């Protein structure tokens, strides 16, 4: 049993493409000068979406099905409005994910993780159990368990605050 609010999309194709000849996209972009010659071919998704018990999904949230295996939202997790969960993502038990969070493909989120609004997580990362990601945090590397991360790029809260304080002192340095 779960609660699904208005305009939620569950099971859409993930955002997966490859170049027509299977070459590296960066190499292909270097070769061609005209963007009209670039052909990207969609990779169809044949996976599913698995949703645990007592999950709540807010309005206008999109959850992509897995490319081959399932996208998984485990029991007790709550998703706010306007959240995007990409293909092959696994979200642990009892997570709280606030509005406008985007989690890119194949990322694994541990249990009891809290994400503030507008957090962005790059693909193929791991977010450890009991971690907190403050609002607008940009995550581009794995996050160990029990960490409080903030900023862009994400860093531990104490380091982020120290960095910000140093930045504010710069005008006084002569």
Residue ranges and their predicted role:
Residues 2-23, 27, 31-156:
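Structural signal for interior beta-strand "rungs" in well-ordered beta-sheet cores
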Residues 155-174:
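Long, leucine- and charge-enriched amphipathic alpha-helices
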């Amino acid at each position: 049993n779960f609660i699904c609010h208005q305009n939620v999309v569950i099971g859409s194709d993930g955002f997966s493409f490859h170049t027509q000849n299977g070459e590296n996209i960066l190499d292909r972009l270097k070769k061609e000068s005209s963007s009209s010659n670039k052909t990207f071919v969609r990779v169809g998704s044949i996976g599913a979406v698995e949703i645990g018990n007592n999950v709540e999904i807010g309005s206008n949230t999109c959850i992509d099905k897995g490319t081959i295996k399932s996208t998984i939202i485990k029991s007790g997790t709550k998703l706010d409005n306007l959240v995007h969960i990409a293909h092959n993502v696994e979200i642990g038990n009892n997570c709280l994910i606030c509005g406008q969070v985007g989690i890119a493909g194949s990322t694994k989120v541990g249990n009891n993780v809290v994400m503030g609004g507008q957090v962005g997580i790059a693909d193929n990362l791991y977010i450890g159990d009991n971690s907190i990601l403050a609002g607008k945090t940009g995550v581009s590397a794995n996050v160990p368990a029990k960490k409080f991360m903030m900023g862009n790029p994400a860093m531990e809260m104490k380091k982020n605050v120290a960095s910000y304080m140093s930045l504010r002192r710069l005008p006084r340095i002569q």
